[in-house]
Amino acid sequence: MTDATRTPSSDALLFPACQPADSGMLALDRRHTMHWEVCGNPAGAPLVFIHGGPGGGSLPHHRRFYDPAFWRIVLYDQRGAGRSTPIADVVDNTTQHLVADLERLREHLGIARWVLFGGSWGSTLALAYATAHPGRVLGLVLRGVFLASRAEIDWFMHGMRQVYPEAWRAFAEFLPPAERGDLLRHYHARLASPDPTVHMPAARAWDRYESACSALIPRAEALARHDDDAAALAIARIEAHYFVHDGFLADGALLAGVARIRHLPCTIVQGRYDVICPPVTADALARAWPEAEYVVVPDAGHSVREPGITRELVYAVNRMQDRLAAR
């Protein structure tokens, strides 16, 4: 990859920073504990931010896409991610567990129905939750759609070299020549190792690859995030775990489930030059869900921090706010 070029900050498009009014650790089972937080209006319309990865975790930046005077904003970290414990753990960590965890959090917070806001893997989990619990959902805002199909996983592991050959070459050549015939299997084996001298170099290589391909014009600070070893290990290990198991979803299951949620308001925001999650997937979802609003951002890739993506997500949430306020 050539030297990263700084893009204008998208922060000016967001709402002011707000601090959590409440937070906690929710026991999910005998092994996993979920970190959660709530900010904004405690009596407001509930909205939950569903982070990507899987394994990505929630960040303070993710509180700022919504008007804190209107929304009761919930952020949380999925199993093995962020401040949930144990970090980077893939035991009892499947899509079905994550759907059940989200429902457990809703019940814990006393929320009847909420808006789902998720991008990338967050869109996958939002759709999986909504199709399992449509009566608990007020609406959806999705970004950079990923449906966890084998074709999408193969694209991530191999196809992105068509656009980012330098980044893919570094990713592949991290492995010895004998292991390059099956990148996913051999990365998964290394990332699953309990030995830090084995799993950490693999995690850094995986995270550098994904970061390099995430934005139309990469930002230097985004490419530096792999300096955080715990975050790099969580996202690499958990992504590889999900990918090797096809996302714990039958191919086509999420699209087939759209019939159960077509009555819900939804906006799909997609970067035209998203290489991580190419527009063909969002297009398929939009065709299966003609009632949804489909917005293609002409000058953006995958990253939520790209100004065009940020702008359209804020607009989408504001439209959802107007819809709920008019009820």
Name what the model sees in each region.
Residues 96-114:
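Conserved acidic catalytic loop of the alpha/beta-hydrolase fold
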Residues 137-187:
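A catalytic-pocket lid/entrance helix-loop region that shapes and gates access to the active site
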Residues 27-86:
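Conserved HGGG/HGGXW glycine-rich cap/lid loop of the alpha/beta-hydrolase fold
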Residues 250, 275-281:
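Conserved alpha/beta-hydrolase "acid-adjacent" motif
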Residues 11-34, 239:
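N-terminal cap/lid segment of alpha/beta-hydrolase-fold proteins
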Residues 112-154:
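Conserved hydrolase catalytic core segment
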